[in-house]
């Protein structure tokens, strides 16, 4: 098996599309899609994805190195694994996305958009993940880690978002995120169209979207900054004990509301460079628009992913409260 990332960036296929290593079999399922199944019995089926946004390169490089180490025998595979490089079309252009945000296309969202390379890719990803979980052992617990980096600074630099779900959240997933020295966990309050919403809603996978720092071009990342999450995902796929947390207790937030842009004249009382987890207190106005202002009713709230430039009708930010 040649270099997984290089093949994907070059739009090429490996010389052979399947093969066997010392302790696992593998299949190239298509561009940026690699399935690995251990010869021994397994009790977890894990999806590791990166590059759903094409310019978020550090997680892509982490998965590439993990893949290289699996094939070199430096890392032993103990779970059934699907490696996903989400948006090769945007990766090759160094862009977050080319036409539309792929991470808003899942749960059938692509059906409401014009047919593009990216909408077709979202459909392929849904089909590939569905087949992967359906062909895995019925006894295997299902997991999905979707790795991202942020386009803005953050007062809490690394955090994970859990999709809204009516079934309970998986303790092993939460433990792995705590061990990865993430600063915060955020629980969604409504269904969405993200990759992790898709895997959680449709396959009851224990899923999380991880935000791991700043987006930089390929080759410019200091991967030592991602050592904690790298160690954890390697321990997950090899079923080794998780490392001990080295940071203070992880903070936990709940999404309480979404800021919806209803009018063209929409203004947020934040600077363009305001970091994630900027705060507002009771009585302060977060956003103004002719149809009505958003005034804080709680003692304190935090703002995540503020973006006043979205299209009318879309979410311009998430409002969070902290769970004590």
UniProtKB/Swiss-Prot annotation:
Zn(2+) binds at residues 53, 56, 148. SUPFAM superfamilies: Zn-dependent exopeptidases. Pathway: Amino-acid degradation; L-arginine degradation via AST pathway; L-glutamate and succinate from L-arginine: step 5/5. The keyword Zinc applies. The keyword Transcription regulation does not apply. Gene3D superfamilies: Zn peptidases. One of its GO terms (biological process) is arginine catabolic process to succinate. The active site is at 211. Binds 1 zinc ion per subunit. Its cofactor is Zn(2+). InterPro entries: AspA/AstE_fam, AstE_AspA_cat, Aste_AspA_hybrid_dom, SuccinylGlu_desuccinylase. Its EC number is 3.5.1.96. Keywords: Arginine metabolism, Hydrolase, Metal-binding, Zinc. It catalyses: N-succinyl-L-glutamate + H2O = L-glutamate + succinate. Belongs to the AspA/AstE family. Succinylglutamate desuccinylase subfamily. Transforms N(2)-succinylglutamate into succinate and glutamate. This is Succinylglutamate desuccinylase. The gene is astE.
